Amino acid sequence: MASTRPSPVDGVRPPATADDLRQWETPYADALDRHAAREQIPLMVPGHGGDGLGLSARLAEFIGERPLQLDVPMLMDDIDLGEDSPLSRSLDLAAEAWGARRTWFLTGGASQGNRIAALAVRGLGANVLSQRSAHSSFSDGVLSAGLVPSFVLPSIDTDHGVAHGVSPAALDDALAAAAADGRAADAVYIVSPSYFGAVADVAGLARVAHAHGAPLIVDGAWGPHFGFHPDLPESPARLGADLVVSSTHKLGGSLTQSAMLHLGHGPFVDALEPLVERAVSITASTSTSALLQASLDIARHSLATGAELIGRSIVAADAFRDALRDDPRFGVLSDGFGAFDDIVAVDPLRVAIDVSSAGVSGHWLRQRLADTDGIFFEMSTATSLVALIGAGKTPDLQRAHRALAAAVDSEEAQTHRSRVADHGFPALPDPGALQMSPRDAFFADTELVPAADAVGRISADTLAAYPPGIPNLIPGEEITAQTVAFLRAVAGSPSGYVRGAADPGVEQFRVTRLG
């Protein structure tokens, strides 16, 4: 399925390109450079003082003195203070680059952005309609904000246990059902792209949400590079989304934990802007990392001016997919995306590999490649591996293919196949019924019970298999036998991890007390 570029909504500036000279600027990073070049006697935080002396010697040996010199505190003249500060100019350039009305830099990752979004839309009303495969950080935000959720289920690839997206028709039906149930949505939250690169019809979803009187929030964490090359999907902010969470560090080149939040141009932005600003202020650190913010400034510059390099990444990823198609041991998951009406495009920088023909678990294969070959894939399922190619990068994908082939042909793989044949892996479970609000369940009187006794009880925790971090269970949901089996299988798999679990093996569940 080829990526498509729908037309941006009226009044939105076209994508920034290398021809836009302003996008070559990095005002905030340059301001840090100027500050670091000054002769200084720092008698303030941070305690390392910008050098490798005293207690900081080991730190300077570890990362070098340059990061210490650039690690300046907040509220500095000629850096982040004032209406026309270097920071404010960098934020304006980012908004322009992604087609937003306004952009915020985040140093708590897209997880902070999701919590901000939940807090902000609470100012519009208590009811939110959320894609059930939303990231666990949005579930955390729903709980914190006291939102009342209802859900729209994504399409599911049952062969691979993969959740994709939501079509405009499915969203329309879900919004109508919520309204008929007396819980008309005050906001809508969807995910695009998915963890496997499936891109939803954001423009169509925005039209549906707006027709029902609700803003559209898009968790675009996995698509920070969208809009910066003709062969990439468009930025959601240009397609009518009211708020877009963007995890710039994932594929956009900034440092880990840095992200952005974009306010779009939809009919709700005037109401949302002050709410978002207030939510940012109560979720952000009062000691924001200058290094993380500078990395966002530079990543924006690199994306906006780097179409040629991004094109090379796309060519490399396409060649990797072609090689996998020619290898009978593997397949490409996105080749089957045409069967799902919610998918209108594919992220070409994400290569989802079908390993079912090889007869090995994706979890085993991912761990084997990391341990033996130093090749690290983003995530795995029982039948797949997902590779990410950072925008502008051209890793040695031929070597990765050779290592994949060698791993599945190894004696260890044969031993693993016999175990897989004997035991298999549980299917992705359907969510249990929501029996009480997440907030009420979280703050209820709770107890820990063995996994076998948890079936039929109400969860007090959010439990999410990582990666990708989609909650398999949220506070207030009934715990099903299928969910217990799935989470325990994930916890027991190579590199398996369940966020929010009471113990590493998911042997106990925290539930609300009976009576």
Regions from the PLM with identified roles:
Residues 273-277, 294-303, 344-349, 379-385, ...:
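Short acidic (Asp/Glu) and glycine-rich catalytic loops that position anionic groups and cofactors
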Residues 18, 28-31, 37, 82, ...:
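Conserved PLP-enzyme active-site core in the AAT-like
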Residues 1-66, 464, 468-471, 500-502, ...:
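N-terminal glycine-rich, Lys/His-bearing helix-loop that initiates the first secondary-structure elements
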Residues 102-104, 246, 374-378, 497-498:
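A short linear hydrophobic-aromatic micro-motif
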Residues 62-112:
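Conserved N-terminal alpha-helix of the aminotransferase class I/II PLP-enzyme fold
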Residues 368, 372, 379-515:
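PLP-dependent enzyme catalytic core of the Aspartate aminotransferase-like
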Residues 308-386, 391, 412-432:
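Conserved small-domain helix->loop->beta segment predominantly found in fold-type I
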Residues 194, 302-303, 357, 391-395:
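A generic structural motif
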